[in-house]
C-alpha cells in the first residue's frame, strides 16, 4: 500500500474537531472519517448546520403590582418557541428533511437564553431556515419592544456539495466495503462529521461505518464484529488506493 496518514479529532462531539486541522500538512488526495453507524454505512452528504442563541431580557416586578409593568422572560421564551414549525423538529423528520432543535434553555423572569440548532441538506432551504430564525426574533421584538438579542453562526456545511465534484473517494470506499464482504448502504448523514469541514479544506472526506447505533443516548452501543469489518474496510481502501 501507499503512505497512510491518521489524524485524531478530540473535539468532534462539540463540533470543533477540525477547527485546527492542518489540511496542508496532512496532504492527501482524500480521506475518511470513522464516525458512521450500522454495518456497511457509507456517507458523503451531511447537513448544513448553524446555531442561533436568543437572549431575552425581561422586567421583574413584584407579582402583586406587575400589571402593565412585568415582562416575563419565561413566557416570552415560550412564545418565541411556539413560532417555530411544530413538525420541523428531529422527532418528526427523516432522510433529507431539515429541522430546528431547541437544544437547551435557561430562563427566569428577568432573563432567558435559548439555543437552537438549524439543519438542512439543501443549501437554499438552509439559508431560508436561518432567515426564518432571525424573523422570529423580529416578531417578538415588534410585540414586546427590543427584548430579544441573538447571535447566529454557521457550524459546518454539506460536504456532498464538494464530494459530488469528484466521487473517486466514494467509489473506492464502496468497493472496499464490498471487498470486506459487506453490502454498502449509501445514505445522507443526519448530522455532521469532521469531514464536513475537512472536505471544504480541499480534502474530500466521506464517512464510514464503525458499528455503532443509538448515538447520543442511553441505549448507545457498538458491535465488535461490525467494528472489525470497519477495520477490514480500511485495509481494503489502502489496497485499492495503491492501484
Language model: regions and residue ranges:
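Alpha-helical metal-binding/catalytic segments enriched in His/Glu/Asp
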Residues: 1-13, 52-56, 62, 67-87, ...
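Acidic/histidine-rich catalytic neighborhood of metal-dependent amide-processing enzymes
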Residues: 1-47, 89, 93, 97-103, ...
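General structural feature for long, well-ordered alpha-helical segments within catalytic domains
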Residues: 2-3, 17, 27-28, 73-76, ...
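Structural motif
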Residues: 4-5, 29-32, 52-53, 184-185, ...
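Metal-dependent peptidase/peptidase-like ectodomains
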Residues: 23-75, 122-178
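Short beta-strand elements
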Residues: 51-58, 103-107, 118, 207-210
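His/Asp/Glu-rich mid-to-C-terminal helical/loop segments that flank catalytic regions of hydrolases
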Residues: 71-89, 124-125, 130-136, 171, ...
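Active-site-adjacent substrate-binding region
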Residues: 75-92, 99-101, 147-148, 157-206
Amino acid at each position: 500500500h501507499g503512505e497512510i496518514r491518521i489524524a485524531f479529532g478530540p473535539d468532534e462531539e462539540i463540533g470543533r474537531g477540525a477547527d485546527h486541522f492542518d489540511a496542508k500538512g496532512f496532504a492527501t488526495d482524500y480521506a475518511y472519517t470513522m464516525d458512521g453507524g450500522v454495518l456497511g454505512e457509507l456517507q458523503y452528504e451531511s447537513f448544513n448546520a448553524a446555531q442561533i442563541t436568543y437572549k431575552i431580557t425581561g422586567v421583574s416586578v413584584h407579582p402583586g403590582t406587575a400589571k402593565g409593568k412585568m415582562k416575563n422572560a419565561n413566557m416570552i421564551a415560550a412564545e418565541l418557541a411556539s413560532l417555530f414549525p411544530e413538525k420541523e423538529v428531529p422527532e418528526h423528520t427523516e432522510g433529507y428533511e431539515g429541522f430546528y432543535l431547541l437544544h437547551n434553555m435557561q430562563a427566569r423572569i428577568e432573563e432567558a437564553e435559548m439555543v437552537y440548532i438549524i439543519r438542512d441538506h439543501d443549501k437554499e432551504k438552509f439559508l431560508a431556515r436561518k432567515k426564518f430564525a432571525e424573523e422570529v426574533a423580529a416578531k417578538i421584538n415588534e410585540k414586546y419592544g427590543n427584548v430579544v438579542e441573538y447571535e447566529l453562526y454557521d457550524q459546518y456545511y454539506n460536504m456532498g456539495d464538494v464530494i459530488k465534484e469528484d466521487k473517486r473517494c466514494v467509489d473506492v470506499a464502496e468497493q472496499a466495503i464490498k471487498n470486506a464482504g459487506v453490502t454498502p448502504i449509501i445514505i445522507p448523514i443526519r448530522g455532521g462529521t469532521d469531514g464536513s469541514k475537512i472536505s471544504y479544506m480541499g480534502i474530500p472526506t466521506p464517512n464510514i461505518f464503525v458499528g455503532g447505533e443509538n448515538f447520543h443516548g442511553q441505549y448507545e452501543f457498538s458491535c465488535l464484529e461490525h467494528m472489525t469489518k470497519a477495520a477490514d474496510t480500511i485495509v481494503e481502501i489502502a489496497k485499492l488506493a495503491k492501484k
